[in-house]
């Protein structure tokens, strides 16, 4: 980064605004010697907006596998054979509520019900709504990730007690055709907009390390800023055997930290949440909170095991951070 780029970075931090596209690209291209200053800028922005509270979330995979979509990273796609993902139908109402009961033993702000497939519809959607409607007084907020739902379905979901809807853009619009061909980027954007119109908070981010350029990572960050999403979950590719991306080399720890910082600096008012792939940070996992994260997904992911929540709670305590609970 040159002097003007660093000045633009700090002007944004001290002014309470976001960095521009040029500065965002320069952040991703920063040298290792500039890492500390960039993390300091991102951390300062996070502390001013969110303080020392961290939002924890977890998910339940309530329908797995046999997905009609061809997302190149996903073990649940029916297009790819030999992946390790389990396949099972939608859980019963009682099974979904059992998942929520177990989740309530941890200090979560959000717990999300996730299903494979393009979109959950009809009686299946009613089934999830019934399960959630009977659990309004839980210690956490209900979240759902049920695919490309239309406005009426999202409204029904909100009326059942769901507070937040998760629906990633996955990648920049210019790179999306390399990620999925069975539905469009525009469909994903429309779902996000409809969720907001239905009164839901929106958790919307993407998956990094798919082969996209630095410019395309910035493109995704700017798209999320334009959509004014509430939470940005950042996932970093875990190459899964049997998928087209099984041989892609994961991002290195310092590149992951710079990527987190860039998303924070472009989105000063949104939660930035570390989701899948943080094992790639190895010994630097706690650095995510210096890079701009104020949210963390805990427990297992959709098709990959995570680490125990006790380990994460100890990490937060060691960092002097506190857990934010249901509003």
Curated annotation (Swiss-Prot):
Q: In the Enzyme Commission scheme, what number(s) does this protein have?
A: 2.8.1.6
Q: Name any one GO molecular function.
A: iron ion binding
Enzyme class, UniProt record, top EC level? transferase
- GO biological process, alphabetically ordered: biotin biosynthetic process
Give the Pfam families listed for this entry.
BATS (PF06968), Radical_SAM (PF04055)
Q: Which UniProt keywords apply?
A: 2Fe-2S, 4Fe-4S, Biotin biosynthesis, Iron, Iron-sulfur, Metal-binding, S-adenosyl-L-methionine, Transferase
Pathway, per Swiss-Prot/TrEMBL? Cofactor biosynthesis; biotin biosynthesis; biotin from 7,8-diaminononanoate: step 2/2
Check the record and name the PANTHER family matching this protein. Answer: BIOTIN SYNTHASE (PTHR22976), BIOTIN SYNTHASE, MITOCHONDRIAL (PTHR22976:SF2)
This protein is called Biotin synthase
Q: Taxonomic lineage per UniProt?
A: Bacteria, Pseudomonadati, Thermodesulfobacteriota, Desulfovibrionia, Desulfovibrionales
